[in-house]
Regions:
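Acidic/histidine-rich catalytic neighborhood
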Residues: 3-32
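FAD-dependent oxidoreductase catalytic-site/capping-region signature
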Residues: 17, 28, 32-173
Length: 173
Protein backbone atom coordinates (compact mmCIF):
# COMPACT_ATOMS: atom_id res chain seq x y z
CA UNK A 1 0.00 0.00 0.00
CA UNK A 2 1.34 3.39 -0.99
CA UNK A 3 -0.64 6.36 0.28
CA UNK A 4 0.18 9.98 0.93
CA UNK A 5 -0.48 11.42 4.36
CA UNK A 6 -2.55 14.60 4.30
CA UNK A 7 -1.60 17.17 6.94
CA UNK A 8 -4.20 19.81 7.73
CA UNK A 9 -2.67 23.02 8.99
CA UNK A 10 -5.30 25.51 10.11
CA UNK A 11 -5.46 29.19 10.94
CA UNK A 12 -7.95 31.50 12.62
CA UNK A 13 -8.50 34.69 10.61
CA UNK A 14 -9.00 38.19 11.97
CA UNK A 15 -11.71 39.16 9.47
CA UNK A 16 -15.04 37.51 8.60
CA UNK A 17 -13.96 36.50 5.08
CA UNK A 18 -14.13 32.71 5.20
CA UNK A 19 -16.88 30.26 4.35
CA UNK A 20 -17.22 29.62 8.09
CA UNK A 21 -18.85 33.03 8.45
CA UNK A 22 -21.27 32.44 5.60
CA UNK A 23 -22.19 28.99 6.89
CA UNK A 24 -23.19 30.30 10.32
CA UNK A 25 -25.32 33.15 8.97
CA UNK A 26 -28.90 32.23 8.08
CA UNK A 27 -29.12 35.19 5.68
CA UNK A 28 -25.83 34.24 3.97
CA UNK A 29 -27.02 30.65 3.54
CA UNK A 30 -30.13 31.92 1.77
CA UNK A 31 -28.00 34.17 -0.46
CA UNK A 32 -25.66 31.28 -1.29
CA UNK A 33 -28.57 28.99 -2.13
CA UNK A 34 -30.26 31.61 -4.30
CA UNK A 35 -27.04 32.47 -6.14
CA UNK A 36 -26.51 28.84 -6.98
CA UNK A 37 -30.14 28.30 -7.96
CA UNK A 38 -30.25 31.37 -10.23
CA UNK A 39 -26.69 31.61 -11.60
CA UNK A 40 -25.13 28.22 -10.80
CA UNK A 41 -22.27 30.17 -9.23
CA UNK A 42 -21.00 31.12 -5.78
CA UNK A 43 -19.77 28.96 -2.89
CA UNK A 44 -22.03 26.01 -3.76
CA UNK A 45 -20.39 25.86 -7.19
CA UNK A 46 -16.82 26.01 -5.84
CA UNK A 47 -14.63 22.98 -5.32
CA UNK A 48 -13.65 22.17 -1.74
CA UNK A 49 -10.20 23.63 -2.33
CA UNK A 50 -10.01 26.77 -4.41
CA UNK A 51 -6.24 27.06 -4.66
CA UNK A 52 -3.64 24.42 -5.43
CA UNK A 53 0.12 24.52 -5.35
CA UNK A 54 2.92 22.13 -6.22
CA UNK A 55 6.37 22.77 -4.77
CA UNK A 56 9.59 21.07 -3.77
CA UNK A 57 10.62 20.21 -0.22
CA UNK A 58 14.25 20.84 -1.14
CA UNK A 59 16.11 22.70 -3.89
CA UNK A 60 18.08 19.48 -4.40
CA UNK A 61 15.18 17.61 -6.01
CA UNK A 62 14.10 18.10 -9.62
CA UNK A 63 10.32 17.87 -9.48
CA UNK A 64 7.69 18.96 -6.95
CA UNK A 65 7.10 16.48 -4.16
CA UNK A 66 4.58 18.50 -2.11
CA UNK A 67 1.01 19.34 -3.06
CA UNK A 68 -1.16 21.96 -1.37
CA UNK A 69 -4.92 22.38 -1.38
CA UNK A 70 -6.11 25.64 0.18
CA UNK A 71 -9.65 25.90 1.58
CA UNK A 72 -11.30 29.00 2.98
CA UNK A 73 -12.81 27.23 5.98
CA UNK A 74 -11.90 25.18 9.03
CA UNK A 75 -13.88 22.28 10.46
CA UNK A 76 -14.86 21.67 14.08
CA UNK A 77 -13.70 18.09 14.66
CA UNK A 78 -16.49 17.44 17.19
CA UNK A 79 -19.37 18.45 14.92
CA UNK A 80 -17.89 18.02 11.44
CA UNK A 81 -19.24 21.49 10.60
CA UNK A 82 -17.40 24.72 9.83
CA UNK A 83 -16.02 26.44 12.92
CA UNK A 84 -17.90 29.44 14.31
CA UNK A 85 -14.97 31.77 13.65
CA UNK A 86 -13.24 32.76 10.39
CA UNK A 87 -10.63 30.23 9.34
CA UNK A 88 -8.60 28.66 6.55
CA UNK A 89 -7.04 25.26 6.00
CA UNK A 90 -3.90 24.19 4.17
CA UNK A 91 -4.11 20.49 3.26
CA UNK A 92 -0.60 19.37 2.42
CA UNK A 93 0.64 16.02 1.17
CA UNK A 94 3.88 14.37 0.14
CA UNK A 95 3.38 13.22 -3.44
CA UNK A 96 5.88 10.36 -3.54
CA UNK A 97 6.30 8.93 -0.05
CA UNK A 98 8.76 6.11 0.46
CA UNK A 99 6.76 4.54 3.31
CA UNK A 100 4.77 1.45 2.42
CA UNK A 101 1.86 -0.03 4.29
CA UNK A 102 -0.29 -3.07 3.79
CA UNK A 103 -3.88 -4.21 3.55
CA UNK A 104 -4.66 -7.52 5.23
CA UNK A 105 -7.75 -9.68 5.20
CA UNK A 106 -9.27 -10.19 8.62
CA UNK A 107 -11.13 -13.35 7.62
CA UNK A 108 -12.65 -15.18 4.68
CA UNK A 109 -15.91 -13.30 5.32
CA UNK A 110 -16.29 -10.74 2.50
CA UNK A 111 -18.39 -8.50 4.78
CA UNK A 112 -15.46 -8.02 7.17
CA UNK A 113 -13.50 -4.86 6.51
CA UNK A 114 -9.81 -5.44 5.80
CA UNK A 115 -7.13 -4.35 8.22
CA UNK A 116 -5.41 -1.27 6.76
CA UNK A 117 -1.94 -0.41 8.05
CA UNK A 118 -0.80 2.75 6.23
CA UNK A 119 2.62 2.85 7.94
CA UNK A 120 2.94 6.60 7.36
CA UNK A 121 6.21 8.36 8.19
CA UNK A 122 8.20 5.14 8.47
CA UNK A 123 11.23 6.49 6.60
CA UNK A 124 13.59 9.34 7.44
CA UNK A 125 12.83 11.02 4.10
CA UNK A 126 9.07 11.00 4.68
CA UNK A 127 9.65 12.50 8.13
CA UNK A 128 11.89 15.21 6.65
CA UNK A 129 9.22 16.14 4.09
CA UNK A 130 6.46 16.26 6.73
CA UNK A 131 8.53 18.67 8.83
CA UNK A 132 9.24 20.79 5.76
CA UNK A 133 5.53 20.87 4.87
CA UNK A 134 4.75 22.45 8.24
CA UNK A 135 7.62 24.92 8.04
CA UNK A 136 6.79 25.93 4.46
CA UNK A 137 3.11 26.39 5.31
CA UNK A 138 4.08 28.73 8.12
CA UNK A 139 6.20 30.76 5.71
CA UNK A 140 3.28 31.04 3.30
CA UNK A 141 0.89 32.12 6.07
CA UNK A 142 3.42 34.72 7.26
CA UNK A 143 3.72 36.27 3.79
CA UNK A 144 1.67 39.30 2.77
CA UNK A 145 -1.08 39.75 1.88
CA UNK A 146 -2.13 36.54 3.65
CA UNK A 147 -0.31 37.50 6.85
CA UNK A 148 -2.54 40.54 7.27
CA UNK A 149 -5.64 38.36 7.78
CA UNK A 150 -4.07 35.58 9.89
CA UNK A 151 -4.93 35.89 13.57
CA UNK A 152 -3.43 32.65 14.92
CA UNK A 153 -2.20 29.22 13.91
CA UNK A 154 -4.58 26.61 15.30
CA UNK A 155 -3.02 23.33 14.16
CA UNK A 156 -0.36 22.30 14.81
CA UNK A 157 -0.24 25.45 16.97
CA UNK A 158 2.41 28.03 17.85
CA UNK A 159 3.91 25.81 20.58
CA UNK A 160 4.90 23.17 18.01
CA UNK A 161 8.43 24.30 17.18
CA UNK A 162 10.93 21.44 17.10
CA UNK A 163 11.26 18.78 14.42
CA UNK A 164 10.07 16.16 16.90
CA UNK A 165 7.00 18.22 17.81
CA UNK A 166 6.21 18.65 14.11
CA UNK A 167 6.50 14.88 13.62
CA UNK A 168 4.27 14.23 16.63
CA UNK A 169 1.64 16.47 15.03
CA UNK A 170 2.01 14.71 11.67
CA UNK A 171 1.68 11.29 13.29
CA UNK A 172 -1.44 12.30 15.20
CA UNK A 173 -3.06 14.11 12.28
Amino acid sequence: LQDHLQLRITYRLNKPISFNDQYHSYLEKIKIGMEYYIKRSGPMAYPTAQVGLFTRSSPLIDTPDIQYHFSNYTIDEKTGLPDKFPGMTFSVCHLRPQSRGEILLRSTDADQHPRIIPNYLSTAEDCRVAIEEIRLTRKIAATEPLASVVDAELDPGPDVLTDEQCLDFARSN
